[in-house]
């Protein structure tokens, strides 16, 4: 299987399955000398891990990360960093009924057609459990970018199902299981997700992720534009079906004289482009939004076929998120951090000696 790595100079490779022994990652390209402990990674893993609220999957995994290489006496050595998370709460028997059938809306059918075989336990490699390693690797990137440049990467949920958050208070985001910055929207989110679980169905979600204080100049036109790589990274997250940069799809109804992000000697007058111009960071806040589809793992029976290509019905058992967007915020933050870290290293490799004609304007 190809496609298990992302990045060029900051390169993350993951492996492992939902019900296997564990999850692993190799993170290459981390500069030497970064103070790094397992606790630095655990903070974000704890934000993502399952079983933390009644609004997410009840699979209880501690997701304790182990650093097995690349760190000596508390600092990175510049060699590949090996990471390991052991699985502890697999219940593979819950998936015995789908060994011969395909769950609609999942990768079961396509994996079987492509590889001729699949690990049906919890979705195997296609499970969102794989994203735990992305979060661990992304935490390394977030720490380096924060210490080196003061970059702040953070996200919040703006919509669950048909319920929309109207306000954003960053102080509220860590205070609820939805990563929502609108305290008034939280009870509506709770009621909706509770109702969905009782009905045996699920819903989608929308998230916004911001990267503040990103220096101007990161991005490699034309095929490796910063926004192109961000979109690629976000689309690699399970269930993501849409990505917006800046104003996103709203630009279809906008006019050039309103949205061209005029600039003066004192700074930019707007940020409709989302902090990226010509595929290169402008120094403004990078704004990304993603839409996640409803999980197809629901307790309502659905039509499918079996390995004999016969029509049948399937009822998905197991422990699943009624809304996958609830735990997606730290995953999206991690993917944005990984892309930014990679582009910093690439920019430094070619352009470290470039002297612009004037200092960057205020974002």
Swiss-Prot record:
This reaction introduces a second double bond into the aromatic ring system. Its EC number is 4.2.3.5. One of its GO terms (cellular component) is cytosol. GO terms for biological process: amino acid biosynthetic process; aromatic amino acid family biosynthetic process; chorismate biosynthetic process. Keywords: Amino-acid biosynthesis, Aromatic amino acid biosynthesis, FAD, Flavoprotein, FMN, Lyase, NADP. GO terms for molecular function: chorismate synthase activity; FMN binding. Reduced FMN (FMNH(2)). Coiled coil: none annotated. This is Chorismate synthase. Belongs to the chorismate synthase family. It comes from the Bacteria. NADP(+) binds at residue 48. FMN binds at residues 125-127, 238-239, 278, 293-297, 319. InterPro entries: Chorismate_synth, Chorismate_synth_AroC_sf, Chorismate_synthase_CS. Its cofactor is FMNH2. Homotetramer. The keyword Flavoprotein applies. Pathway: Metabolic intermediate biosynthesis; chorismate biosynthesis; chorismate from D-erythrose 4-phosphate and phosphoenolpyruvate: step 7/7. It comes from Acinetobacter baumannii (strain ACICU). It catalyses: 5-O-(1-carboxyvinyl)-3-phosphoshikimate = chorismate + phosphate.
């Amino acid at each position: 299987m190809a496609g298990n790595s992302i990045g060029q100079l900051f390169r993350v490779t993951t492996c492992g399955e939902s019900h296997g022994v564990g999850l692993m990652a190799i993170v290459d390209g981390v500069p030497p000398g970064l103070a790094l402990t397992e606790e630095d990674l655990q903070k974000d893993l704890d934000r993502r891990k399952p079983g933390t609220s009644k609004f997410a999957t009840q699979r209880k995994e501690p997701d304790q990360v182990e650093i097995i290489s690349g760190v000596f006496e508390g600092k990175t050595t510049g060699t590949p960093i090996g990471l390991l998370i052991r699985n502890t709460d697999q219940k593979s028997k819950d998936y015995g009924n789908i060994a011969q059938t395909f769950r609609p809306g999942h990768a079961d059918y396509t994996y079987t057609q492509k590889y001729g075989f699949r690990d049906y336990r919890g979705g195997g490699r296609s499970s969102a459990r794989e994203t735990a390693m992305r979060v661990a690797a992304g935490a390394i990137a977030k720490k380096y970018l924060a210490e080196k440049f003061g970059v702040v990467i953070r996200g919040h949920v703006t919509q669950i199902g048909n319920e929309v958050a109207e306000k954003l208070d960053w102080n509220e985001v860590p205070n609820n299981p939805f990563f929502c910055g609108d305290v008034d929207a939280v009870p509506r989110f709770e009621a909706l997700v509770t109702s969905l679980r009782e009905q045996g169905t699920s819903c989608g979600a929308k998230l916004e992720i911001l990267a503040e204080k990103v220096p101007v100049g990161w991005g490699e036109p034309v095929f490796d534009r910063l926004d192109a790589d961000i979109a690629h990274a976000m689309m690699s997250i399970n269930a993501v079906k849409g990505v917006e940069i800046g104003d996103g799809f709203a630009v279809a109804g906008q006019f050039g004289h309103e949205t061209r992000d005029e600039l003066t000697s004192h700074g930019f007058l707007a940020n409709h482009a989302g902090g990226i111009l010509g595929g290169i960071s402008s120094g403004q806040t990078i704004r990304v939004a993603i839409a996640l589809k409803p999980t197809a793992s629901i307790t309502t029976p659905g039509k499918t076929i079996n390995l004999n290509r016969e029509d049948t019905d399937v009822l998905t058992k197991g422990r699943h998120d009624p809304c996958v967007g609830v735990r997606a915020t730290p995953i999206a933050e991690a993917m944005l951090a990984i892309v930014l870290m990679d582009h910093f290293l690439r920019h430094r490799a070619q352009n470290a000696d470039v002297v612009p004609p004037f200092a960057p304007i205020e974002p």
